[in-house]
């Protein structure tokens, strides 16, 4: 999810946490694909080369690892990388369907599950079905590590949530699901990646978002809310 990309970016490069990502979303592997695009530009473009050098020398911060994986291998891959280095947080990108036993198995090994939702009825219904299955099949059997499941509003039109969202949130509450207080607004800036034109970037696996674009994005507030839920103290 886009909001996850920004959370990792902010946690690792701004807040000072050590983050790792296991991309199990086969066959898209969108995070692994973004890392490959980022690396290609960073290696070929002098502007990004200098940016990477400055970041490493100033922060002493390498890029967070992105492991291309699958739902079958997800937990083994996570165990392998956490044996090699100490990470504060390991994020998993999982497919948006639970019709596979390996997805259920991987999910049951998560500590927390945070799923993005939008006011698009089809997307919302699909996500709610997903999370209901997670709650019913995994948590109620008692065979899981899950400490909490949460939803986060993504692509919210306008600065304020409308009455429509309140109606949706009533339905969500009736299903026994929790929604985070912070929402992510809909904005074209979120699509800004590394480019040959060196425009201020927002979405990257190698660099933090440009401060001018971060304002009003709610990424900082969302990250702080998640850190509170996870009982992690601020490293920043």
Regions found by a protein language model. Name each.
Residues 1-6:
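Short, small-residue-biased leader/transition segments that mark boundaries at the very start
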Residues 9-89:
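P-loop/Walker-type NTP enzyme "switch/lid" segment
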Residues 30-31, 111, 184:
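Generic structural signal for small/hydrophobic residues in well-ordered secondary structure
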Residues 82-103:
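Switch II (G3) loop of P-loop NTPases
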Residues 102-121:
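Inter-motif core of Ras-like GTPase G domains
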Residues 127-140:
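Conserved C-terminal guanine-recognition region of P-loop GTPase G domains, centered on the G4
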Residues 155-204:
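Beta-strand-loop-alpha "switch" segments that mediate conformational coupling across diverse proteins
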Residues 201-236:
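NTP-binding/hydrolysis catalytic cores, primarily Walker-type P-loop NTPases
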């Amino acid at each position: 999810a886009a909001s996850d990309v920004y959370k990792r970016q902010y946690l690792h490069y701004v807040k000072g946490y050590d983050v790792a990502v296991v991309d199990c979303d086969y066959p898209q592997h969108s995070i692994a694909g973004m890392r490959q695009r980022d690396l290609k530009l960073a290696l070929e473009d002098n502007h990004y080369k200098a940016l990477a050098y400055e970041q490493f020398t100033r922060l002493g911060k390498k890029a967070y690892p992105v492991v291309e994986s699958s739902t079958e291998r997800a937990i083994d891959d996570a165990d392998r990388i956490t044996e090699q280095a100490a990470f504060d947080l390991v994020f998993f990108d999982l497919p948006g369907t639970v019709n596979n036993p390996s997805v259920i198995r991987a999910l049951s090994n998560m500590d927390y599950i945070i799923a993005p939702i939008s006011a698009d009825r089809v997307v919302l219904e699909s996500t709610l079905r997903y999370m209901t299955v997670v709650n019913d099949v995994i948590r109620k059997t008692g065979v899981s590590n899950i400490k909490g499941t949460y939803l986060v509003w993504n692509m919210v039109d306008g600065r304020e949530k409308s009455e429509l969202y309140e109606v949706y949130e009533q339905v969500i509450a009736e299903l026994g699901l929790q929604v985070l207080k912070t929402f992510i607004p809909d904005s074209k800036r979120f699509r800004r990646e590394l480019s040959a034109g060196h425009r201020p970037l927002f979405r990257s696996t190698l660099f933090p978002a440009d401060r001018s674009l971060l304002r009003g994005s709610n990424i900082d507030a969302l990250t702080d809310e998640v850190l509170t839920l996870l009982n992690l103290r601020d490293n920043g």
